Amino acid sequence: MTYSTVNINTPPPYLALASNEKLPTVLSIAGTDPSGGAGVEADVKTITAHRCYAMTCITALNAQTPVKVYSINNTPKEVVSQILDANLQDMKCDVIKTGMLTTAAIEVLHEKLLQLGENRPKLVVDPVLVATSGSSLAGKDIASLITEKIAPFADILTPNIPECFKLLGEDREISKLRDIFEVAKDLAKITKCSNILVKGGHIPWNDEEGKYITDVLYLGAEQRFITFKGNFVNTTHTHGTGCTLASAIASNLARGYSLPQSVYGGIEYVQNAVAIGCDVTKETVKDNGPINHVYAIEIPLEKMLSDECFTASDAVHKKPVKSSLNKIPGGSFYKYLINHPKVKPHWDSYVNHDFVRKVADGSLEPKKFQFFIEQDYLYLVNYARISCIAGSKSPCLEDLEKELVIVECVRNGLCQHERRLREEFGIKDPDYLQKIQRGPALRAYCRYFNDVSRRGNWQELVIALNPCLMGYVHALTKIKDEVTAAEGSVYREWCETYSSSWCHEAMLEGEKLLNHILETYPPEKLDTLVTIYAEVCELEANFWTAALEYE
């Protein structure tokens, strides 16, 4: 028999600076969903995901899954009272969030709010009346009790459309945004809660871009509406979205954000959780599955394993990665990527773009090219930053040095753009470049880069950076003999830069780097690299489209 001793690391030094961290605290008063998608369980996950400390007061023990509510077992009034007393006596509480409330819970909470007076925490009320599955979670008089006893104390009320109708005591036709405004204003009067968030998930709208969701925040004290337009996700898996949104808003308020900021943050968090989704139900569950509350949470062990000073190698052995290169036809990962069904449509749109053709024949309007140069300048600054991050994640000195070479090349590209703006477009203001604003296409691209750099590994980050060089050189080399822009013009000079022998050599090095990436990446995760390449090619095409459409 053998044994070994594994030394446990102390907290990372920087994290240790936050020892005895003061966490914002949120108390959830709601029923349970033992399947984890809604109720108190969803609240605790959401509050934790926002780096807040979650406390609970369970109003009912429910036998519930995304399929339906099988039974509701209300917590006795005296137990609810004891739980609230204990929590409010011994624990700090920045925000209270309510979900499913029973008659007993409403009466107890009403008494506590009166007792607390001006010292009461902020209150976010999600008037849970019906589960997403359609099951009733409240008696017919609960709506009136919430209106009378709880809502007047609330900082914000977050009903969906059906819940608005129950609280108003009548159904209404919703055919335009103004109808939702009227619902919000009338609800504020009836409930005596000045801030109302009407959730629009039940009534998606349509425009030229397709379906979208509109949530409306009414700020009564300011007599102002804020509409939040979000993407419509074509999914039926939305179990627990209401609970999650209210808890996210409560957590943001606990962290000191303003109400509009807190609502925005909550909406985006929920939409991300819906869009990313999770596979946790059995195949028999076809509709109303849970959302992914933990999409932004890091796995502690992954950080430990990536720590160069990790001390527990005896306990955790890294499996050697089997190369996938021998499975790639022709031995070129680059050619495999650009011909992959997921990548090819975006690659073709990118390298055959009209922007390149218009630059090549000199027909592009100067203002559009100036816009491109300005946006590309900001893009290259971000590209350099991301390359530095890639270098910091690289496994060896050789790979780090490659990123430093790339940064130097980017610096040269920035100098060329500065010269073009100065000589071709008469820009003399030395602060001009600092005043340029990112357009929507560039914002989307930079957001993608920043997210991969924050969450991805070295291989994934290199894959994200690769299409820029490969696509430009491919596109300009392809039409090298068709360039008719005037000799000495900025258009011809730009075309000749990317069709030069130097850029072609850099492209060959990029192809070698892609093969190196494939040799060191887990084969079972290959689709991740393919998806990243496809999405970045689409972003590149959109970047050129933005220049063509600039007015």
Swiss-Prot record:
Q: Name one GO molecular function term.
A: hydroxymethylpyrimidine kinase activity
Q: According to its record, what are the GO cellular component terms? A: cytosol
- Per the UniProt entry, what is one GO biological process? thiamine biosynthetic process
Q: What are the UniProt keywords, alphabetically?
A: ATP-binding, Kinase, Nucleotide-binding, Thiamine biosynthesis, Transferase
From the UniProt record, give the pathway where this protein acts.
Cofactor biosynthesis; thiamine diphosphate biosynthesis; 4-amino-2-methyl-5-diphosphomethylpyrimidine from 5-amino-1-(5-phospho-D-ribosyl)imidazole: step 2/3; Cofactor biosynthesis; thiamine diphosphate biosynthesis; 4-amino-2-methyl-5-diphosphomethylpyrimidine from 5-amino-1-(5-phospho-D-ribosyl)imidazole: step 3/3
**Which residues bind 4-amino-5-hydroxymethyl-2-methylpyrimidine per the record?**
Q64
Q: Please give the record's induction comment.
A: By absence of thiamine.
The Enzyme Commission number assigned here is 2.7.1.49, 2.7.4.7
Catalyses which reaction(s): 4-amino-5-hydroxymethyl-2-methylpyrimidine + ATP = 4-amino-2-methyl-5-(phosphooxymethyl)pyrimidine + ADP + H(+); 4-amino-2-methyl-5-(phosphooxymethyl)pyrimidine + ATP = 4-amino-2-methyl-5-(diphosphooxymethyl)pyrimidine + ADP
Q: Which family does it belong to?
A: In the N-terminal section; belongs to the ThiD family. In the C-terminal section; belongs to the thiaminase-2 family.
Q: What does this protein do?
A: Catalyzes the phosphorylation of hydroxymethylpyrimidine phosphate (HMP-P) to HMP-PP, and also probably that of HMP to HMP-P.
Question: What protein name applies here?
Answer: Hydroxymethylpyrimidine/phosphomethylpyrimidine kinase THI21
